[in-house]
């Protein structure tokens, strides 16, 4: 039987912060385990997450920043989402292959970058829509597609404007944590990766 594993990527959290002001995280760490990780340079979200998932340095996985310089457009494109931008075998691919003889190995990837089209069972990531009239519609991408709708029917629309930019705050992390709990309850993944950008 596969023992479920939840990996929380919490920006800026250090072991010294676990304590009376973080009772739920402290309890979770006590029931399982918590470990500090070093980082790579540049120490930005997309690069560090890609290193954690592949075990490779940026020179190996190819993610050297949060943005990509598109020569044809002479423009930096930030926050790209395609899983195909990352080179190398991912943790969830290696784990799935290692337990291939055991049926039922599953992965949930909640709000990690490069989440679109990832070979996982369940995933959700921010993905605004831009209609022809110039508006920005708060939205997200999910695999399977109806997962987003099911989560939003229970939790409301993902608060994208609280995820990044000048209005960023803990509201987005609360939504992601609640969505992750729902996915854990509904599907019981073998491996769950959740990114919480704010405390």
Each model region followed by its residue ranges:
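Short hydrophobic "helix-edge" motifs at membrane interfaces and signal-peptide entry regions
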Residues: 1-2, 134
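Beta-strand elements within well-structured catalytic alpha/beta cores of enzymes
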Residues: 2-18, 27-28, 52, 95, ...
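Functionally constrained cores in energy, signaling, and assembly domains
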Residues: 5, 9, 29-34, 49, ...
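Glycine-/proline-rich flexible loop or hinge segments
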Residues: 6-10, 30-35, 45-48, 67-80
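Generic recognition of stable, solvent-exposed alpha-helical segments in well-folded globular domains
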Residues: 8, 13, 20-23, 90, ...
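Short linear motifs at secondary-structure transitions and domain/linker junctions
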Residues: 11, 25-28, 39-40, 81, ...
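Short, structured active-site-proximal loop/turn typified by the sulfatase FGly-forming signature C/S-X-P-X-R
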Residues: 16-60, 108
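His/Asp/Glu-rich, glycine-adjacent segments
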Residues: 56-199
